[in-house]
Amino acid sequence: MINLFLLKYKTAFSTFLKPFAYLSLILSVCFYSIQAQAFPVFAQQAYENPREATGRIVCANCHLAQKPVEIEVPQAVLPDTVFEAVVEVPYDLSLQQVTGNGTKGPLNVGAVVILPEGFTLAPKDRISSELKEKTKGLIITPYNEANPNILVVGPVPGKDHQKLVFPVLSPNPAENKNVHFIKYPVYVGANRGRGQVNPTGEKSNNTVYTSPIDGQIVKLEKSDNVTSFSIKSKTGDIITVKVPFGPDILVKEGQTLVADQQLTNDPNVGGFGQVETEIVLQSPARVKGLIAFFFTVILAQILLVLKKKQFEKVQLAEMNF
């Protein structure tokens, strides 16, 4: 009797928990999908520094198409000053990209700004209300603890953030002996849209797929999220190519192929770009000295003019006499 009661209780309890199990699974999948789009995280986990020795920013390893990007910073800044670094990521807002599940959706954007050593993200209490409004909706973070001068942001909706504003705090050489009053380079990389290569090295569903060999498609099979091509080579070997949903299929079963022939179109509408500029950390003493020099020159000019007029009056008086 007790065993029967326990069996019924166990069955009822399992039935009660089943919807929660499904809900948990759905939430975990959704959470994973959201995290899978967080492309700056991949670079942060794989590279200690996003700029390689060749000068290339590592985002280009996954975002293969080249697109323009612009950076705007002041020509010069004083020490311990908050200023704006504005990254522009232009693209056609009417474009739609292939999302992770193969459907079409809007593009997102992201950027990395590699500042000189000592330059950091401005503290919240140093940011003006106007600058806070410009950075609304952006979560800007240092690349890692070892590189607080490297700032990353994204992915964020591109329709709202074609201009990414970074609030930056300049260093003070009086407090940091590694910083000097000189001209420094600033490197910027920015992308719009998803990458063509996953961090694992596999192709994403946002790129073109080609045939690896000469042969014939003997079988073309579609499942829930993958299209499988069975290609028979001239030697009789069967090679299977799996294409995730997203790209449009350009071939059909029975078709003869040559190596590197496209099996799909290229759905990518985004791309990555990098650019560099320069900024001067200006000494206040130099600025004061320059102002004093200009004042001295102007004062000398005024005195010279007054002296000249006085001399002319003396000459005129002597002539009249």
Swiss-Prot record:
Segments forming a coiled coil: none
Cofactor(s) named in the record: heme
UniProt record, GO biological process: photosynthesis
Signal peptide: 1-38
Residues reported in the UniProt entry to bind heme: 39, 59, 62-63
Cofactor note (record): Binds 1 heme group covalently.
Name of the molecule in the record: Cytochrome f
